[in-house]
């Protein structure tokens, strides 16, 4: 029988390693595999804002599997049924968006664990994650290898951050800069000094609680700031944004800049 593969991303968090990631929003296994050959420590497959179906997520997991980059899946929301599907297709690390309270965090923890630790539905014999029933003691191994990250991205979540950090089974907390800045009254302005102060404070509080702290920064200078503040899993770009920037830059070499978008982009 096959042994369940370890979760190198989770091991990296435990060792307090700095892990650099990339956001995948293109929804294709082809682009996912290209990214996986680039050497990023982790790749976030986005099911919240990118139009990914569960089958799309499945194909991207397959494309990334032969490489060292570790996949993280962000589902559209943290419902028990959807979490069950995403785990069954082989995800070992989840980023759950819009977690505002400790009770929500506890519900997500329960949805990701098999009984008696939680309420994850049992279907190992038809699940890629269990090699279709070929992994001995799969349920216990799955509970152990699961890495759960929750996303804090609202004023309410900030008020409840300490309580969320106390929830057992949460491995890390990810700060969502776009929604957070909008919730704080600074839409599309995560660089505002007040937002920056809050982000720095949150990273410190997360690390002080013994959890991993994550962030997405499409601006390299902001990514460096977050790393200096103590964030230890940071995504430094979005595939679709990098693609559009490269397209526009190449076109600008041959056509007047007036015909090419020069708008500053943010996630």
Swiss-Prot record:
GO terms for molecular function: 2-keto-3-deoxy-L-rhamnonate aldolase activity; magnesium ion binding. InterPro entries: Aldolase/citrate-lyase_domain, HpcH-HpaI_aldolase, KDR_aldolase, Pyrv/PenolPyrv_kinase-like_dom, Pyrv_kinase-like_dom_sf. It catalyses: 2-dehydro-3-deoxy-L-rhamnonate = (S)-lactaldehyde + pyruvate. The record marks 74 as: Transition state stabilizer. It holds the Pfam family HpcH_HpaI. Mg(2+) binds at residues 153, 179. GO terms for cellular component: cytoplasm. SUPFAM superfamilies: Phosphoenolpyruvate/pyruvate domain. The record marks 88 as: Increases basicity of active site His. Substrate binds at residues 151, 178-179. Binds 1 Mg(2+) ion per subunit. Its EC number is 4.1.2.53. Its cofactor is Mg(2+). Belongs to the HpcH/HpaI aldolase family. KDR aldolase subfamily. Catalyzes the reversible retro-aldol cleavage of 2-keto-3-deoxy-L-rhamnonate (KDR) to pyruvate and lactaldehyde. NCBIfam families: PRK10128.1. Homohexamer. This is 2-keto-3-deoxy-L-rhamnonate aldolase. It comes from Salmonella typhi.
